Amino acid sequence: GIGKIKSVVAELCFNTSQTGYQETLTDPSYAKQIINFTFPHIGIVGTNNEDLESNEIFAEGCIINQPIDNYSNWRAQKNLDDFLIYHNTPGITGIDTRYLTKKLSKEGAKKVALINFGENKKKLENIKESLKMWGGLENLDLATIVSTKNH
């Protein structure tokens, strides 16, 4: 895995961009979604504070085929793993993301759970129940979740 070690329930979507993974993760339009990155190598340019779309990651998690820890970019400040940990965001790696994208494009978005293998049986049952109960993105007030707060 990559990022924060935790389990989440969300809608699975995909992104086919070859670059811009940091911008995608911090894009508020991905709120309450787990992003499947179709491009196989994610993390090659690291992350930095200039390329944020917002101050936090609104995606619930990400799926990456092959993460790259050793970034190659003079502007980079953190690798992707550290960036995800800092933003409390989990990820899973080693998945055939292109196959998953084909499946999603044919069948539509799915509600899924990204589960940490270290979860105990009771917590795993709670996650399964959360997945059953989660109603998806429909009727969620996402604007309230992603909007800046009045000061």
Each predicted region: which residue ranges?
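RNA-binding accessory domains that recognize and position tRNA/RNA substrates
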Residues: 1-151
